[in-house]
């Protein structure tokens, strides 16, 4: 289970509420569970209920995973950009030349699909092809 502070950050983020440190404070009074000790209602609105925190957390968690999936996909695409240049697989321009450019194009298409529409669950990325060069 996520900490109360993480649940609050999730609630504020999902509801597009801008906050700064000090707008709320959590803590554990002696012998009690973690709770909200102070809440800036003028800036943040009404203090959220546990039900609101519970509802926001999985949405926020999905958004975090989605953002990570997109970041990973963009990085993988960037790392293989060189495979798409016209000269890399053309004997007229390059010797040696890449003989399996089609494998890279297929790979990049699958990765691009994740980058364009990142899932909210951890993505399964395809395996990058191994470069094969003419001899």
Question: What feature does the model see in each segment?
Answer:
Residues 1-135:
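A preference for well-ordered globular domain cores
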């Amino acid at each position: 289970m996520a900490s109360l502070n993480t649940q609050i950050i999730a609630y504020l983020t999902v509801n597009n509420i801008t906050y700064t440190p000090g707008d709320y404070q959590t803590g554990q009074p002696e012998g009690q569970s973690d709770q909200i000790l102070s809440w800036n209602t003028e800036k943040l609105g009404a203090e959220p209920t546990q039900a609101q925190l519970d509802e926001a957390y999985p949405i926020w968690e999905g958004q975090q995973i989605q953002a990570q999936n997109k970041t990973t996909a963009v990085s993988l695409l960037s790392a293989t950009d060189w495979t798409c240049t016209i000269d890399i697989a053309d004997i007229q321009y390059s010797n040696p030349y890449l003989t399996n450019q089609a494998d890279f194009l297929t790979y990049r298409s699958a990765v691009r699909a994740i980058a364009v529409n990142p899932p909210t669950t951890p993505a399964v990325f395809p395996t990058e092809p191994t470069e094969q060069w003419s001899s």
